[in-house]
Design a protein with these regions (language model features):
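Structured, basic alpha/beta domains of bacterial-type, RNA-associated proteins
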Residues: 70-127
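Generic, well-ordered alpha-helical segments
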Residues: 51-53, 65, 77
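Intrinsically disordered, Lys/Arg-rich N-terminal extensions and targeting peptides
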Residues: 1-53, 126-134
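Short, charged beta-turn/beta-strand-edge "cap" motif at the junction between a beta-strand
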Residues: 62-69
Length: 134
């Protein structure tokens, strides 16, 4: 694999090349790596198993010390592939509070932010495709 990111590169069995692909990917491609499982209700409704996280989505934390808590996504860090969730904060030694960032695999989307018309259109398109298959 070349030094820069290449869209024509398919895959490799070597973990170092897989890590390099993810690290060198442009931000619009890294957004796809932030996919998170949907809740059972959303899965049935839209016929999709997972979607990329967005600011405004409500997520349930499935792993770690904050397990079981549900809140809105405050920010999405594409460079580090991390997500900050409302109210999930740690207190630093000086007393200031800092957001705790989560990896997307530790979350589950409970409600979607449907402000974006393109996102709604994509969901409806997938929904109609699944109905045609059945």
């Amino acid at each position: 694999m070349k030094q820069e990111f290449s869209t024509s590169w398919i895959s490799s069995t070597q973990p170092r090349k897989q890590r390099k692909f993810i690290a060198n990917a442009p931000l619009h491609t890294k957004h796809r790596f932030l996919s998170t499982n949907l809740s059972k209700e959303l899965r049935q409704k839209y016929g999709k198993r997972n979607l990329p996280l967005r600011k405004g989505d409500e997520a349930l934390i499935m792993r770690g010390t904050f397990r079981g808590k549900k809140a809105k996504v405050v920010s999405v860090d594409l460079r580090n592939s991390r997500v900050a969730i409302e109210g999930m904060q740690r207190t630093k030694k000086d007393g200031s509070k800092v957001n705790v960032f989560f990896r997307p695999f530790a979350l589950q989307i409970q409600t979607l932010n449907l402000d974006d018309k393109q996102r709604v259109a994509a969901l409806n398109r997938k929904q109609s495709e699944n109905k045609e298959k059945k």
